[in-house]
């Protein structure tokens, strides 16, 4: 009987302690200037590709980190412009400028695909895959 009371007490405490998952917002908190459109799953670690001649054409690349996730391209107002091919748990994304490919020079977005253990490479600013399905790394 004692175990039943302990179980009931523990359940009650857990229920009440988890009822509000967000910390209260302070009155003097700084509000974001722009918020991107929401994605279905966990998102973080954005990268910004800066257009070489017109900064207003720069884009934000963010990850949707679930099994059916991908890279998302946003304009500077936070509107989704494009989604990459489906990636299996993409992780962080980074931008590199001036990669020599044959006679061309391109900018790239690079992410890891955790479920396939591959590096994925996309040409910028079109977010097109250029890695023939990924580069195995593990």
Task: Indicate where each model-derived feature is located.
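Sec-dependent N-terminal signal peptides
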Residues: 4-13
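Blade-loop segments of beta-propeller domains
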Residues: 76-117
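C-terminal motif of bacterial Sec signal peptides marking the signal peptidase cleavage site
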Residues: 15-17
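Short coil turn/linker residues within repeat-based beta-strand modules
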Residues: 67, 75-80, 126-128
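Asp-box/WD-like beta-propeller blade repeats and closely related beta-sheet repeat scaffolds
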Residues: 115-138
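A short beta-strand motif characteristic of beta-propeller blades
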Residues: 31-39, 80-85, 131-138
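Blade/loop signatures of beta-propeller domains
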Residues: 21-31
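Beta-strand-rich domains and repeat architectures in extracellular enzymes and scaffolds
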Residues: 33-69, 91
